[in-house]
A protein has these predicted regions:
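ATP-binding N-lobe of GHMP and related small-molecule kinases
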Residues: 1-74, 84-96, 107
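ATP-dependent small-molecule kinase catalytic core of the GHMP/sugar-kinase superfamily
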Residues: 4-11, 95-209
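Short, basic/glycine-rich phosphate-binding loops at helix/coil junctions
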Residues: 29, 82, 205-209
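Amphipathic, positively biased hydrophobic alpha-helical segments used for protein targeting
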Residues: 82-86, 90, 123, 130-131
Length: 209
């Protein structure tokens, strides 16, 4: 989205299975970490404890993680998995969107949050002046007969953290005509193709994006 109607960004995304963040948590006297990527888990768990003003600690075991910085939204999935497991262990009732706001996720795309809530092919509405987390505009079941091939370049990783924010901040404003064309392609191209299981049309419209 180009911002002319008061909203920026806007995303499309598809959830995938078998590349999960699997986390276990229980109350503890202090923060205890086991398993994978403790250097990534620690600040997330500390942020949860600080945000909820809970004086207890957490025992967190990270069993599995999706690949990082390759476009799978692993940072959001890890943050929400730890936050959900930790909040549940501490008896704190928080929705995924409340946890996302506490964890500072969804600054641009809402796909990772929506994917944590449920599966499917997802379109979010970007950010407006008062947006906390981008709203889901559409969620469709992806045709089960369709297959997706994921290719990872192990020679390099994408940006994250401050470099990623700087890269987004440096992007020029998208021309209104291009933003309109992309929105139209999603609304009357991609979404109907998914709804009608029209793989040829879906592929053609996706190639336009």
């Amino acid at each position: 989205m180009h911002g002319g109607l008061g909203r920026r960004f806007g995303s499309i995304g598809l959830t995938v299975s078998e590349l999960d963040a699997q986390v276990w948590a229980a109350p503890a006297a202090v923060l205890q970490l086991e398993g994978l990527a403790a250097e990534r888990v620690a600040p997330i768990a500390r942020r949860l404890l600080a945000a909820t003003a809970d004086n207890r600690g957490l025992h967190v075991i990270t069993h599995a993680l999706p690949p990082a910085h390759v476009g799978l939204g692993s940072g959001t999935q890890l943050a929400l998995a730890i936050a959900a497991a930790g909040a549940g262990a501490l008896g704190l009732a928080r929705s995924p969107r409340e946890l996302a706001a506490l964890m500072g996720r969804g600054e641009r795309s809402g796909i990772g949050i929506a994917a944590f809530e449920d599966g499917g092919f997802i379109v979010d509405g970007g950010r407006g002046p008062t947006t906390t987390t981008p709203p889901v505009l559409a969620r469709l079941s992806f045709p089960p007969a369709w297959r997706c091939l994921l290719l990872f370049d192990e020679r390099a990783q994408g940006l994250s953290g401050a470099p990623e924010r700087a890269a987004f901040d440096s992007l020029p404003t998208m021309p209104a005509a291009r933003a309109g064309r992309l929105a139209r392609t999603v609304l009357v191209g991609l979404l109907p193709a998914v709804a009608e299981s029209d793989f040829r049309a879906f592929s053609a419209h996706l190639a336009q994006i």
